């Protein structure tokens, strides 16, 4: 089964090297990283704010950024993640890491700070 559509002209609104779909944590950092490396980037987000499901649905924890190393909870994911966390911390929107279910290290944040 197939559908045939007539040919049509579609306007282009720009030319980009990288198009990132979704303005969640991964999308934000992917777009920023590509732009810093000289790419022309378009970040497409369906909501009127960034943050992905964290801000849209109230999932307000980053999981996987920290690990238990010799009894200490330490951040193990760095790079541009540090910049994101620093910006949220400057807005007083970041809490200390904590345990969920006794084994998952998570870092809670203020959803409003992620939208900025």
Where do the PLM segments sit?
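N-terminal Rossmann-like FAD-binding beta1-loop-alpha1 element of flavoenzymes
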Residues: 18-42
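Short gly/ser/thr-rich secondary-structure transition/capping motifs
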Residues: 1-5
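Conserved N-terminal/central alpha/beta ligand/cofactor-binding core
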Residues: 7, 13-15, 33, 39-40, ...
């Amino acid at each position: 089964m197939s559908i045939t559509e007539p040919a049509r002209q579609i306007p282009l609104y720009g030319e980009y090297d990288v198009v990132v779909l979704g303005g969640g944590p991964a999308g934000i950092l992917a777009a920023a990283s590509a732009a810093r490396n000289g790419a022309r980037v378009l970040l497409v987000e369906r909501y009127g704010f960034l943050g992905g499901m964290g801000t849209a649905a109230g999932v307000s924890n980053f999981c996987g950024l920290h690990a238990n190393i010799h009894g200490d909870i330490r951040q193990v994911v760095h790079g541009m993640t540090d910049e994101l966390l620093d910006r949220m911390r400057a807005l007083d929107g970041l809490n200390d890491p904590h345990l969920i279910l006794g084994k998952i290290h998570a870092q809670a944040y203020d959803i409003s700070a992620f939208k900025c």
